[in-house]
Regions:
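A polyanion-binding, active-site-adjacent surface
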Residues: 1-117
Length: 117
């Protein structure tokens, strides 16, 4: 059964888009980007942007959008056992619509990839 990713987190003034591959099992269960307990994303972003990575998820997202950073994933859906990018079944990959996203978010000037796929 295909896994479905999340909607992007972005406001109209976002300048940087950080892309993962596809949310892991814990993230999908929690309904939150980078929710895995060993994931270093929030501690690193907290250090970089000067916020407490333990603050509630909604506030962390607010810190990101306030800093002009958008979050999304490369894949809209896929099939995968577990959470590893290496386990994604290539023939099931459905990419997100980046052309439409970038048209709507015309201030994006850079895209960073935070995944292996």
């Amino acid at each position: 059964m295909p896994l479905a990713g999340f909607a992007p987190v972005a406001d109209s003034q976002a300048r940087l888009l950080i892309l993962g591959s596809m949310p892991g099992v814990r993230s999908l269960t929690a309904g939150q980007y980078y929710a895995g307990p060993r994931n270093r994303f929030w501690p690193l972003m907290g250090e970089f942007l000067g916020f407490d990575p333990a603050m509630p998820y909604g506030r962390r997202l607010g810190e990101m959008t306030d800093a002009g950073i958008a979050l999304w994933d490369v894949l809209q859906s896929c099939e995968r056992e577990g959470s590893l990018d290496a386990s994604i079944v290539e023939s099931t990959e459905v990419p997100n619509d980046f052309a439409a996203f970038l048209e709507k978010h015309s201030h994006i000037r850079a895209i960073a990839f935070n995944g292996q796929k």
